[in-house]
Amino acid sequence: MSQANDSILVTPGSGATVATELINGKEYQAVVLADNQGQIHGSLESYYYATPTVAVGASKLYLDIFNATGSGKIMDIRGIWIIPATDVALTGALGVRYDLYRTSAIGTGGTAAAYKSATPDVAGGNINPVDTNNANLPAGITARWLPTGGATIAQWLFATYAPGEETATSMAHITQYQNIVPVLTVGQKLTIRENSGILVKQGTVAATGNTKFLVIFTLE
């Protein structure tokens, strides 16, 4: 990761050298963007967590991601995308409600995520670094598909709905990769500090359909 490492006084004839770019005969100052923690935009090590497909179900626990004490990392959730399956001949009558929670304990049961697997839809889902030069995940950062226990809910954050229809002409086709945390891209990041995590859980109303998820997160 990179952080801004200097500041300069913009005083003609003194100070550090400022990078510029010549455009149409004029020099324009070249800049890089930094966030509120001094991280250079685009420099944080990023990872994907892609899950298998599963049939939806009332109150189903889909996935939890946990950042255990001692990981030495702060996790920022950049997006959680719902991906309804459109290659199954099934028509859903109801939309599916997905709730996002903060958790205070790691999930149990289910299947732990694989790391850099070459198998599509591997059991437990698969975590991949965006850049192969990224460091391996700390042992304290884990993901679990279909946990059956643990994942103690500490806070309800919000809910969203996605269609359950699975034909190519349905709303499920139109809303592929629906991000359920878009409002957080304009303010603070959805930050997961040590000894906390997130959980995606279906609402109490039964529905039909099959779905998977894609989570993108960064570490700092």
Residue positions per predicted region:
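Extended, low-complexity segments enriched in Ser/Thr/Gly and acidic residues that occur primarily
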Residues: 1-132, 136-175, 199-212, 217-220
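Beta-sandwich interaction modules
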Residues: 168-195
